[in-house]
């Protein structure tokens, strides 16, 4: 699979890391947070910092959908013990790191948050949380997440997602793959292109985010290849007389086969993938 890792030279990454650290420290000292960074403290990322970040971060290859960048955040202080949930995360302890992540994201695109996710914060804390152990959400800890695309339920979901590994004592990785590697046949593409699936928000969203049963296609063509909206744990196939039925085991076999064809583990040491729309992910 074509992938891109660690764009630029060591000097490029060190320069970006130094600029990022200095900017984040200064902004945190002035009382900024990731959520009020724009426009209260900045109208845009400083040009030299944005250019350095873009030079240091590997943009995903369109066929792969992910890339790994290392070292940009290595100089930040330890954020303290892992909290029991995102609600108990200490904003002061992670202020510099959160600001740095927001600056990286804003250097690559327009940053936004979900009102129904972690009180609308731009930078989320994904930590194992009591009560979520067996759910198909990022805060689970005893179950393997099914292959899925992030926030598939929403037509205006992010085109670029940043995952930053802060602590990984058990050396666990993330699995990523692309629908463009699935080698789907023309009949399979035709079936999966029909707007038949209803994808609902996952269990990390409040109940009032359920929305309407809008049917959507699972795959569709774009100028640079197939794209996908896929989250089998939260997919339903409405029937006129029977309401909703689970995506598995009664969903079209082509939908289930997408997971089987997605098997492509992240290389050893790849802990912070930057992912794009065509990607399937699992942790």
Please place each PLM-identified region on the residue numbering:
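Short, charge-rich binding segments
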Residues: 58-60, 93-96, 153-154
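Catalytic cores of Mg2+-dependent Asp-rich isoprenoid enzymes
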Residues: 272-273
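A gly/proline- and charged-residue-enriched helix-loop-helix capping module
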Residues: 91-138
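Long, hydrophobic/aromatic-enriched structural stretches that serve as scaffold segments
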Residues: 62-90, 94, 102-114
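Active-site environment of non-heme Fe oxygenases that use a 2-His-1-carboxylate facial triad
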Residues: 1-45, 62-77, 125-267, 277-281
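Short secondary-structure transition/capping motifs
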Residues: 41-46, 89-93, 97
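Hydrophobic, Leu/Ile/Phe/Ala-enriched alpha-helical segments that form helix-helix packing faces
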Residues: 53-60, 100-112, 255-263
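Charged, low-complexity intrinsically disordered tails and linkers
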Residues: 40-57
């Amino acid at each position: 699979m074509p992938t891109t890792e660690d764009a630029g030279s060591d000097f490029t990454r060190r320069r970006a890391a130094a600029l990022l650290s200095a900017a984040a420290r200064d902004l945190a000292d002035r009382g900024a947070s990731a959520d009020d960074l724009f426009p209260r403290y900045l109208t845009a990322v400083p040009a030299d910092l944005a250019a350095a970040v873009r030079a240091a971060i590997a943009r995903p290859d369109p066929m792969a959908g992910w890339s790994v960048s290392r070292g940009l955040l290595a100089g930040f202080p330890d954020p303290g013990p892992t909290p029991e949930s995102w609600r108990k995360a200490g904003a002061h302890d992670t202020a510099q790191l959160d600001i740095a992540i927001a600056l990286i994201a804003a250097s690559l695109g327009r940053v936004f948050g979900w009102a129904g996710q972690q009180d609308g914060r731009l930078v989320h804390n994904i930590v194992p949380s009591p009560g979520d152990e067996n759910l198909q959400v990022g805060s689970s800890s005893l179950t393997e997440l099914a292959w899925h695309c992030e926030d598939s339920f929403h037509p205006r979901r992010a085109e670029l997602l940043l995952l930053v590994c802060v602590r990984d004592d058990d050396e666990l990785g993330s699995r990523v793959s692309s629908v463009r590697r699935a080698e789907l046949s023309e009949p399979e593409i035709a079936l999966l292109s029909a707007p038949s699936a209803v994808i609902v928000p996952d269990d990390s969203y409040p109940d009032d985010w359920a929305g309407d049963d809008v049917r959507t296609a699972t795959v569709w063509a774009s100028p640079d290849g197939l794209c996908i909206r896929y989250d089998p744990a939260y997919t339903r196939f409405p029937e006129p007389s029977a309401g909703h039925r689970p995506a598995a085991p009664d969903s079209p076999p082509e939908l289930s086969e997408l997971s089987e064809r997605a098997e492509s583990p992240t290389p050893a040491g790849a802990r912070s993938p930057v992912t794009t729309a065509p990607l399937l992910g699992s942790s």
